[in-house]
A protein has these predicted regions:
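A detector for small-residue-rich transmembrane helices and their helix-helix packing motifs
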Residues: 2-308, 312-317, 424-463
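Juxtamembrane interface at the cytosolic side of transmembrane helices
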Residues: 450-484
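Membrane-interface segments at or immediately adjacent to transmembrane helices
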Residues: 287-361
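N-terminal leader/transit sequences and adjacent low-complexity N-terminal tails
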Residues: 338-341, 346-359, 364, 368-371, ...
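Extended, hydrophilic extramembrane loops/domains of integral membrane proteins
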Residues: 391-432
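A cross-kingdom signal targeting lumenal/periplasmic-facing segments of multi-pass membrane
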Residues: 362-406
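Non-catalytic terminal regions of proteins
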Residues: 266, 289-300, 360, 366, ...
Length: 484
């Protein structure tokens, strides 16, 4: 395939008229923003557009363990990129995409840019999985991750290599707002360093820092594979007098132009990527050594018409199942699990190898709350369950009714009250046996290592051929304001 046909397939403008290239509209960036906003409006409507509904997180979020449970969950690589937790989450993600995405799309062309965006999101999920297993163990793979941050981080990584010489106005707040201007290379280096530092030190913080770092690395690696060098050279020449795409403006003065990244930035970025590479290598060996097998239960429940789905995990100790992950699921799923457990329907050695049916019975159980055991009544309208040879429920469905315990927890204080209302739960449960996440973590650790090494190669030896606006350019301005 010749150069021209390859450029046509991926949207290269190498043979296009220069002025059209210079003024190209970033339609993919705008479209991604619109799609994300529309999805957010749909998924957050039940909360008045303040935060996403938990049901969408359960069905569309990326929980790595679910790839092991059922390969059909591969769709979560993509759906998770378009889900956002709350209004601030989507606002800042879309703002950063708008700020940095337009220039990267202009440099790559729309089709190549879309490929980089989507593959960076997948790369971010791969890093997230590998480092979650290394730093947090198998339980960390149960937590669903959502957001476009990983894909956008790939755009930031590409922007660092393409436009290190653009200037951004950054603002932070210390009593009063303090604003200053700096090269994008320095801002992105600082941002990347924060992700790596907090990724290693803030496990379980509720933010997928390693997904951000992994997306950034994937973006650099993919840029080296997707960039049309012919197009880059043309844009580099066009940047010498005027503006690019209507929002990046330059004047080349007497300052001597330096190609590629500055030595300091290059060394710092390379060091950070090396730290990620070391972690990926450690994750490779850790995944080979540490094997943990779980039984995974998928629960679908409707509480008075409010539908939820969730996953919990059993780990066997001393011949009894320890239920993990109840604190990570939707409240309706958690309440149902507590009732089934209290009623002796999740695990009962006396039911080993049997199928049972219960209709119209009232059972009593206890639930641990605030350091004590609270008696609760459970009405079994209907229950059909199949148990394995250990007495673990592997298939179950039915309808139960029960009051709810409202718990109030504060520092040094815990109280509860049992509601007078009785709530109905219609549910189904399926248990997947012998789930081992170590092979998945091993594969993803190897991929993370390879992406890190490729990006390291790009930063150290290929940045000069990919740069469009080096630091040596005197930047008149670029439409960029970033919060710190």
């Amino acid at each position: 395939m010749d150069e021209g046909s390859r450029g046509w397939i991926l949207g290269s403008y190498s043979s296009y008229e220069p002025r059209a290239l210079k003024r190209a509209t970033p339609w993919v960036t705008y479209t991604i923003i619109v799609v994300n906003v529309v999805v957010y409006l749909i998924t957050s409507a039940p909360s008045g557009f303040i935060a996403i509904s938990s049901w969408w997180v359960e069905v569309g979020g990326f929980a790595p363990i679910l790839l092991v449970v059922d390969s059909v969950n591969i769709y979560r690589f993509f759906t998770s990129m378009f889900l956002h937790g709350d209004i601030f989450h989507i606002f800042f993600n879309m703002y950063f995409l708008y700020l940095f995405g337009r220039g990267v799309e202009g440099a790559l062309g729309s089709k190549r840019y879309l490929i980089l965006y989507l593959l960076s999101g997948i790369g971010a999920a791969i890093f997230h999985t590998a480092y979650s297993y290394l730093l947090g163990g198998a339980r960390a793979l149960m937590v669903p991750a959502i957001g476009a941050s990983g894909a956008i981080s790939g755009v930031l990584g590409a922007y660092l290599i393409l436009y290190p010489g653009t200037k951004l106005t950054a603002c932070t707040w210390f009593i009063l707002p303090v604003c200053f201007t700096l090269y994008s290379a320095y801002f992105l280096l600082l941002w990347f360093a924060f992700q790596v530092f907090y990724g290693y030190t803030s496990v379980g913080a509720g933010i997928a820092f390693m997904a951000h770092a992994g997306g950034f690395v994937a973006g650099i690696a993919l840029l080296g594979l997707l960039a049309d060098r012919h197009r880059i050279r043309l844009l580099r020449a066009l940047s010498g007098g005027g503006s690019l795409f209507g929002f990046i403006r330059y004047v080349f003065g007497s300052v001597q132009q330096r190609e590629g990244l500055s030595i300091g930035v290059k060394v710092a970025v390379a060091l950070l990527i090396f730290l990620l590479s070391a972690g990926a290598l450690a994750g490779t060996f850790y995944s080979m050594e540490y094997q943990a097998t779980f039984d995974v239960a998928k629960i679908s429940v409707s509480k008075d018409g409010d539908y939820s789905v969730g996953y919990v995990f059993y780990q066997w100790r001393h011949m009894r199942p320890i239920l993990l992950g109840r604190d990570l699921v939707d409240p309706n799923v958690r309440v149902l699990l507590n009732r089934l457990y209290a009623a002796g329907l999740l695990y009962e050695p006396g039911y080993s190898g049997k199928q049972i049916r219960i209709v119209g019975e009232m059972l009593h159980g206890v639930i641990p709350v605030c350091g004590t055991e609270v008696a609760i009544v459970i009405y079994i309208d209907e229950f059909i369950g199949t148990y394995d040879e250990r007495g673990l429920l592997v298939e179950g469905r039915g309808t139960i009714r029960s009051p709810i315990i409202n718990v109030i927890e504060r520092p040094f204080f815990c109280s509860y009250e049992i509601t007078d209302d009785i709530y109905r739960f219609d549910f189904s449960l399926t248990t997947y046996m012998g789930v081992n996440p170590a092979p998945l973590a091993l594969e993803f650790s190897v991929v993370s290592l390879l992406l890190s090494l490729v990006s390291l190669y790009i930063v150290l030896w290929r940045d000069k051929e990919l740069v469009i606006t080096p630091v040596g350019a005197s930047t008149v301005g670029s439409e960029g304001f970033v919060p710190l």
